[in-house]
A protein has these predicted regions:
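Low-complexity intrinsically disordered segments
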Residues: 37-182
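Short acidic-glycine loop/turn motifs at beta-strand connectors
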Residues: 10-15, 98-101
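A sequence-level detector of short linear motifs
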Residues: 17-18, 105
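Cysteine protease-like catalytic core of ubiquitin/ubiquitin-like
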Residues: 30-36
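Short, solvent-exposed aromatic-acidic interface loops
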Residues: 18-29, 111
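Short beta-strand scaffold segments in enzyme catalytic cores
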Residues: 4-9
Length: 182
């Protein structure tokens, strides 16, 4: 099973270039990798023109070399066209878009037997929110295992929490800066 995503870059002419990522498309997977390793205009463009990634790591060349397929990049003439593509392809559970010097993320929510398109929001806030839920799930899993000492779940939760706290501080700083400028 996989969590599919698209990584995209909004060009200055309004066109969008994007690549597909097959595994770990959720915020604490691909999202965290984008924040940690592709969080500049140059790196965001580089990751968006890869075409296809089985999974995305901090090393772009390694990610391409380890991919089981190769595909051309997807091009869209406008944001409207890109959003329509995401909405028509619900197997793409997450869409990441570099625009205005930051990553945005789109996703779906399950509603009954269907799904609702959530649109785009700032990746930092989504990563912090979903990351905290993930940490709690891992801590619950570690407790449920009833093992003595620390488990790999505890260790991953600790590592993830450090990254979440860093991005939480960054996000709060950005919000404060915007509020002061208003």
């Amino acid at each position: 099973m996989s969590t599919n995503s698209v990584v995209a870059y909004l060009r200055s002419d309004g066109a969008i270039v994007s690549s597909y990522v097959h595994y770990d498309g959720y915020e604490t997977g691909v999202g965290m990798t984008l924040l940690e390793h592709y969080n500049s205009d140059e790196r965001a463009l580089a990751v968006s023109v890869g075409g296809y990634y089985s999974s995305l790591s901090e090393d772009l060349n390694e990610s391409l070399e380890k991919s089981v397929h190769t595909e051309e990049v997807e091009m869209f003439d406008s944001m409207t066209e890109f959003e329509e593509y995401l909405m028509e392809n619900s197997h793409l559970e997450f869409g990441y878009l570099w625009t205005g010097g930051k990553w945005m993320v789109s996703s779906w929510s399950r509603i009954g037997v269907g799904a609702a398109w959530n649109g785009f929001s700032w990746l930092v806030t989504s990563f912090v929110r979903e990351g905290r839920k993930t940490v709690e799930r891992f801590r619950d899993r570690a407790r449920d295992d009833n093992r003595e000492g620390r488990t790999e779940y505890d260790e991953y939760a600790d590592e993830l929490e450090v990254t979440i706290d860093k991005w939480h501080r960054y996000g709060m700083g950005e919000i404060a800066t915007e509020a002061m400028a208003a």
